[in-house]
Structure formats: structure tokens, C-alpha cells
Design a protein with these regions (language model features):
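Alpha-helical transmembrane segments of multi-pass membrane transport proteins
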Residues: 1-420
């Protein structure tokens, strides 16, 4: 039964593919394989055809582990702050103002509307870090306009879905907060390391739009002159009015982290207050919006923490079954040394992203590859490794058949937009 840990991992993946909630898949698998692999059933007088691999008493520290590594974790306090900030900004009207202004600013160019979606996606990512909110908001606002001006359905949908996922990599990303906790790296270091790659990714999206506009002009036409109704000083004033609020929030949150003025948790709290001030400035701060924002924040934060509890139980049982030793032995014996390990782990994460969500990969796979990465690359390179993982996880929102950004988009798109 030395490979019982691999059966446990396979059972968890199978439950996730069937559609069971992540927390219950991980926790339920932990309970099942505790019964199979521990001395619990033999202690009740039931004989097993194999020797128990660990004593049930080993799990007595599970409550302490949950409260010590989850409930008392100061870093994870940043999660509800960033979620609150993102949801509140969604309700503040920031996206509407940005899309309208950027559409007028870039509208004279072929592909200008698509470029404006990428720019707004990057600004929303640096302001909110919530992928679902960004994709849905831009799909509701930009997709009808793009289709109206004869943009191809494929380009319109692809640009909106891809730009919305920039919130995965451009800080303040909730994914980076969770990933930093899982690999033992400062969230501030991950934010700093991911900022430039995130902007480069947005730049590559713009280059792709420009390439499509040059090679297939009918797919991305320029806006007609009558649609660009602002020029000169009026356009400049509108651009400044649209850009200053999100840039202020970006500087408030990321600037304080990068320059060491505040921790990510403290910056998240300031960002939450800043989002409320922006909503007040746009006359969108109502009691209903505030209650809705708090409700969504509690729901998403609770989901993350319940998954953490299930992942902690899964990790403890997997380790008790000596799964960590099997993983270490396998990864350390891959051909190519550290580069073979890097290629294999990145390929594995990418392929898993076709079938399971980023949060499942973060809680199931990352904790077991992080110690090997630390051994190969050293602590000074772990932020770099974390950013690579985050970039890879970002693709899980787009890769079919379970790309969540595609389903967010389809949920608000007109019937003419199909997933096939």
C-alpha cells in the first residue's frame, strides 16, 4: 500500500471533475483515506488486508494546525480587504467611465475598441484583482458596443475574457495573496515581481489586437467619426477625470506596499476605504450597494477559508501516507535537474488548468512542489517561481472546457455568442 497516497490524490481529482465542492472533496478524501490507511478500523476490531500506515492519534494536531496556520495567519487577512475593494469598485461605476473614455481615445485606430478593453482590463486588474467582476462588467458594457461596430465575435469575446484575467497576475491579486501563503513567500515580493510581467502580458494582448487589425481589418474596424464626439481639451479633461481615480487607488495600494510603507494587509484595508470613497465620489455609495458588497465579500472569503481547512486536512493525511516522500523522490529524480523539474511542474499545472480551477491547483499541487522548488532554486528565487506559477494559473481561466472566464462571459453575452 505504499502508493495509497497517489490513490488519494486521484480520488480528490476525480471528485473535483465530477463537480463536488473543493472543500468537501479535499476534506472527504482525507476522511476516507484516514479510515483506509490508519489504525482506526483495526482499533474497532476490523481486520484490514494491509498494515496501517499511521496512527489516528497523529491527526490530533489538526485543530491546532487549522487555528495556527489559517485563523491566526495575518497575511490571509488581506483576502477580505481586497475582495471588498474589488466588489465595491465594480459598483462604483469606475469601469463604465473608463471604457467610455478609452473607447473615444483609441476609437480612431483600427482595433481601437479592443485596445481600450485591454487597457481598462489592466487598470481594473491593478485596482480590484477580482477576475469574475472584471470579465462580467466589461462583457456587459463593451461587448454590445463592439458587436454594434462590426467587430468579429471571436475577437470581441477573446479580448474581453483575456483582459479580465489580468486580475490574476497584476497586483493586488487575491491569487498572489493565497499563493504567497502556500509557498512561504512575502506577498509584497510577489506583488512586486508580478507587476511588470502583468503589464508585459497586457502589452502582448495589445500587439495581438494590432496584428489582427492589420491582417484582418474587417474584424476590428475603427469607430466612425460620429461616434468620437469629444476632441481637444474636452477629451483631455474626460481622460484625466477617468484615469485619476483608479491611478490614485493603484498608488494608494501598490505604492505603499512597494515602498515598504504598509503591509499587504494594511494596504488592502486602505484600498477598501479608497474604493468606498470612489463610490461616494461617483454617487454610487448606497446602503444597498454596501450591504451587497459585504455579502459578496463574506461569501467569497468564507469559501477560501473553508477550502483552506479541507486542504489542511488533505495535506496532513497525504503526508501521513508518505505521499510527500513519494513526490519528493519523483521530482528530485527527473532528468534535467532544476530545469527538468521546472518544465515538468509548469506543464503539469498548465494541463491541470484545463480541468480544475486555479484555487484547487493552488491548494492541492503547489504545497507539494514548493519544498522541491526551494531546494532547487533557493529562497531568493522563490518569488520568481511564485510569479511563474501565477502566470501559469492565469491560463486556467481561459483554457476549455472549464475556463471560468469563458463561462462568466457567456453568462452575460447575447445568444449569438457561443462557447463552441
Amino acid at each position: 500500500m505504499e502508493y495509497l497516497a497517489f490513490w488519494m490524490f486521484g480520488a480528490a481529482i476525480l471528485l473535483l471533475l465530477i463537480g463536488y465542492p473543493v472543500a468537501f472533496s479535499l476534506g472527504g478524501t482525507a476522511v476516507l483515506f484516514t479510515l483506509i490507511g490508519s489504525d482506526f478500523l483495526p482499533g474497532l476490531g476490523l481486520e484490514l488486508p494491509w498494515e496501517p500506515m499511521f496512527r489516528l492519534a497523529r491527526l490530533n494536531i489538526l485543530p491546532q494546525r487549522i487555528f495556527g496556520t489559517i485563523m491566526d495567519n495575518y497575511t490571509l487577512v488581506a483576502v477580505p480587504f481586497f475582495v471588498f475593494m474589488g466588489v465595491m469598485l465594480e459598483k462604483s461605476g469606475l469601469a463604465e467611465e473608463l471604457l467610455e473614455t478609452m473607447g473615444i481615445l483609441f476609437g480612431a485606430l483600427r482595433g481601437g475598441l479592443a485596445i481600450s478593453v485591454v487597457v481598462v482590463g489592466a487598470l481594473l486588474a491593478a485596482s480590484t484583482g477580482v477576475v469574475g467582476a472584471s470579465v462580467v462588467t466589461m462583457a456587459i458594457l463593451a461587448l454590445p458596443v463592439m458587436l454594434k461596430y462590426n467587430y468579429s465575435k471571436a475577437l470581441s469575446s477573446g479580448v474581453i475574457a483575456a483582459s479580465g484575467t489580468l486580475g490574476q497576475i497584476i497586483p493586488p491579486s487575491i491569487v498572489l495573496v493565497i499563493l504567497g501563503d502556500q509557498i512561504g513567500v512575502s506577498v509584497g515580493q510577489l506583488f512586486l515581481g508580478a507587476f511588470i510581467p502583468g503589464l508585459l502580458l497586457a502589452g502582448l494582448f495589445v500587439l495581438w489586437v494590432a496584428f489582427v487589425a492589420l491582417t484582418r481589418p474587417a474584424s476590428a474596424p475603427a469607430l466612425p467619426p460620429e461616434a468620437r464626439n469629444l476632441k481637444g481639451s474636452k477629451l483631455l479633461l474626460k481622460v484625466l477625470r477617468s484615469l485619476i481615480p483608479p491611478l490614485f487607488l493603484i498608488v494608494l495600494v501598490l505604492g505603499t506596499i512597494f515602498f515598504g510603507v504598509a503591509t499587504p494587509t494594511e494596504a488592502g484595508a486602505m484600498g477598501a476605504i479608497g474604493a468606498m470613497l470612489l463610490a461616494l465620489f461617483n454617487r454610487r455609495l448606497s446602503l444597498r450597494n454596501l450591504v451587497d458588497t459585504m455579502d459578496q465579500t463574506v461569501r467569497l472569503t468564507s469559501m477560501v477559508f473553508i477550502i483552506l481547512v479541507g486542504a489542511t486536512a488533505f495535506s496532513m493525511v497525504f503526508t501521513a501516507l508518505r505521499g510527500d516522500l513519494l513526490v519528493d523522490q519523483f521530482l528530485l529524480n527527473l532528468p534535467g535537474g532544476q530545469w527538468g523539474f521546472l518544465f515538468f511542474t509548469m506543464l503539469t499545472i498548465f494541463l491541470l488548468g484545463f480541468f480544475i480551477d486555479f484555487i484547487e491547483i493552488t491548494f492541492i499541487v503547489v504545497p507539494f512542489i514548493a519544498p522541491i522548488a526551494l531546494r532547487y532554486f533557493g529562497p531568493e528565487m522563490m518569488p520568481w517561481f511564485g510569479v511563474l506559477v501565477a502566470m501559469n494559473l492565469q491560463s486556467s481561466f481561459l483554457t476549455p472546457p472549464f475556463g471560468f472566464a469563458l463561462f462568466y462571459l457567456k453568462g452575460v453575452a447575447p445568444p449569438s455568442i457561443r462557447t463552441g
